[in-house]
């Protein structure tokens, strides 16, 4: 209920969950807070820093500007925006990608005379769809990974793309055809905080290119995890450390790029999952759900029910929660 209502910040709710489980004796301190030292949390923190360097140096801004520059019409511009945002969201923060490119798109809209609302809506949808391209594309992907690791299974780095890439392609095609006619044809009257595009002219070019090189090398290490024998979280940690040690990003900016709400929410969710498993409540809930679908429910029907339930809940609460 607290996750749905969000009367209390989600990060605080997660801490209440952890502390409450200890106070009530459901879990011991070590188990209740084990989620915060999970390997996937370390991966989260590392990739927030690696991705943050691309934003802080202006390299993400530059990539977005170069791609959109080649679009000659509004329709082509929408396609270009969705392609670059979708691909970047697959390996970087969805929110960060959108936040960095929104001022770029607003600037393009002002220069070209296009309505900003017609460009921003496809951008936001592309950021959401792009998160399904890789294991690190969205927090929910790593939560599922943590659940699988409990039974010695895991997703491949780009395994989500089997479903995510077709969704992104269909989304782009939709906005290039039918959706193009449905886009809002009005402009925003209020001047928002995103109107001012950040100036990166004083950032040395070597920092921009090194941030991109380290990101690419980090991703390659993750893709070939099994061959090189280095875990995802370690590859991410090495990339984050290199960025700080080489001076590409300062310690202050590195810490600023970490989304603490996501980290607390992730850790608290893992603790809650541990409590459900320890007490048998998880099995009880699962049996009740399966029982409502009959003695031997089809896995397709069960998946459909869970899918619809998630689709409904995500309209009222955080996707990650």
Regions found by a protein language model. Name each.
Residues 11-12, 16-19, 23-115, 257-262, ...:
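Membrane-embedded alpha-helical segments and adjacent helix-loop junctions characteristic
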Residues 1-45, 49, 162-287, 303:
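Hydrophobic transmembrane alpha-helices of multi-pass small-molecule transporters
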Residues 7-10, 94, 138, 157, ...:
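Conformational gate/switch positions in structured elements
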